[in-house]
Amino acid sequence: MTLLALGINHKTAPVSLRERVSFSPDKLDQALDSLLAQPMVQGGVVLSTCNRTELYLSVEEQDNLQEALIRWLCDYHNLNEEDLRKSLYWHQDNDAVSHLMRVASGLDSLVLGEPQILGQVKKAFADSQKGHMKASELERMFQKSFSVAKRVRTETDIGASAVSVAFAACTLARQIFESLSTVTVLLVGAGETIELVARHLREHKVQKMIIANRTRERAQILADEVGAEVIALSEIDERLREADIIISSTASPLPIIGKGMVERALKSRRNQPMLLVDIAVPRDVEPEVGKLANAYLYSVDDLQSIISHNLAQRKAAAVEAETIVAQETSEFMAWLRAQSASETIREYRSQAEQVRDELTAKALAALEQGGDAQAIMQDLAWKLTNRLIHAPTKSLQQAARDGDNERLNILRDSLGLE
């Protein structure tokens, strides 16, 4: 049995290839069935995200194994083999285990240390459990990767610092406000960055969010997801006083929030502080707002400096994480090697028990016929000893005849002889 990890990711393949190799969720069961129908495949998990498509497999060794699996992948997606081979990576046993642990821990992600990948790996594993997982070693490898990812998050600072604009904006808000559960947040825009911000805020228990956007329909989709209220851009002036935090990211060529608007809001708030995070380019908030007392304005450049600092911290944490992965990989491979001996141990024990049962039955039969108990017990002990040492004795004799001292020493060690 061999463990494999093969696939492509954002480092090896452009999006034009990644989208062709991806597995759609509605056809994943069909793909897994097709994969497990391959004679060499004992178990499989398919991980397919926007940044990677990977197959994790337990397989029987055979000639042309790599070619057979690449051919299946190309046939399934109707791809040219040469196009795929240039971007494909292939990891086996120790390297496959290490790769999965690194992926689950966020060490192989586009954004170093990002936590979302662990959920994606867990989902891929759960999908494979629906009648597709047949290899206990593969299952154990995934379970181990989950515990390693948790250990990496617990013992290092890999996820402690914001390295995306959206996450940095939320981190800044959490640093300034003791609790986000009691604040009101105004989000201006409804694009991808604001979507991420809204989800981060929801995770941190923000109860009241207002989304202001040019088109109500797009904003409403996000609002329904995070439980927010939707208003028009024209209503910002009137509603601004309600907001403790304003995070803005639109494509407007001109500022949406001016100094006068913020002055009026602060006056209505009796100068309770406001945090304004402007992550738009061009800027959505007039720079003069930052000069107002109790208005704390941060631009995208301010966030980038935070991100750069935090990325350096994550890279340092990643070094610690790699050490954990190396240690855990070594321990898992030791367990795997021990498993390979378990079948031999079971067979050896079964053979010994069969000999014991056979000779014990004969001894009991002799006792029932009135035979001498002491003689029967001595005969049982003698025969049992001879039967159990017969095969090891022959192996020792053969090793001695062959002059194979290494094998002789291994046999002596196995038999507990000094």
UniProtKB/Swiss-Prot annotation:
EC number, UniProt record: 1.2.1.70
Residues that bind substrate: 49-52, 109, 114-116, 120
Broad EC category: oxidoreductase
Protein family per UniProt: Belongs to the glutamyl-tRNA reductase family.
Lineage of producing organism: Bacteria, Pseudomonadati, Pseudomonadota, Gammaproteobacteria, Enterobacterales
Catalytic reaction(s) noted: (S)-4-amino-5-oxopentanoate + tRNA(Glu) + NADP(+) = L-glutamyl-tRNA(Glu) + NADPH + H(+)
GO molecular function: glutamyl-tRNA reductase activity; NADP binding
Pfam family, one: GlutR_dimer
Annotated site residue numbers, Important for activity: 99
Name by which UniProt lists this protein: Glutamyl-tRNA reductase
